[in-house]
Amino acid sequence: AFVSTDLQVNKPLRMKKLREYHEVLIGGSRYIELKGRKISLEELSTYPWISLTSEALTRKFLNNYFADHGLQFLPDMELATTDLILPAVRHNLGIGFVPEEFAEEEKKAENVFEIEVEEKLPTRNIILIYDTEYPQSIASKEFQKFLSSQKN
């Protein structure tokens, strides 16, 4: 399995960190007043948020991030997959975190912009969890090669 959050695993399972990635907070034209300045999470918590459903590991990560700063994360819109967040932000339904690579093209096209947050969001990892008692599939090995070849 490939996950984006460190988990506790017991033998015969093992974890292997494959790649780091960063998430960025993005907004659409409706929130242009947020562009070009550092903004606290407390101030940002007053804006409409778009995130994943509460069961998602990324959502739990964001819940903890907000809690670590004395805030509760209460998104106004919950979506099933990360790739749905970007179009929702582009259509000005709120602000949201996405992996940096997801936002690159839309930022270049100026459909969305990055919002600089005072409280730094920790770097995340793509992690492979595998069973040492079974051989890894060809697909798993190829995906690992692909991730290793990508820039950090």
Labelled PLM ranges:
Residues 1-47, 54, 121:
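Acidic, Gly/Pro-rich loop/turn segments at junctions of secondary structure
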Residues 8-9, 31, 58, 84, ...:
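Alpha-helix capping/helix-boundary segments
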Residues 17, 24-26, 30, 95, ...:
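Residues embedded in well-ordered beta-strands
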Residues 61-115:
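Hydrophobic hinge/microswitch elements
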Residues 33-35, 48-69, 136-140, 144:
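Secondary-structure junction motif
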Residues 2, 115-152:
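A late-sequence structural motif
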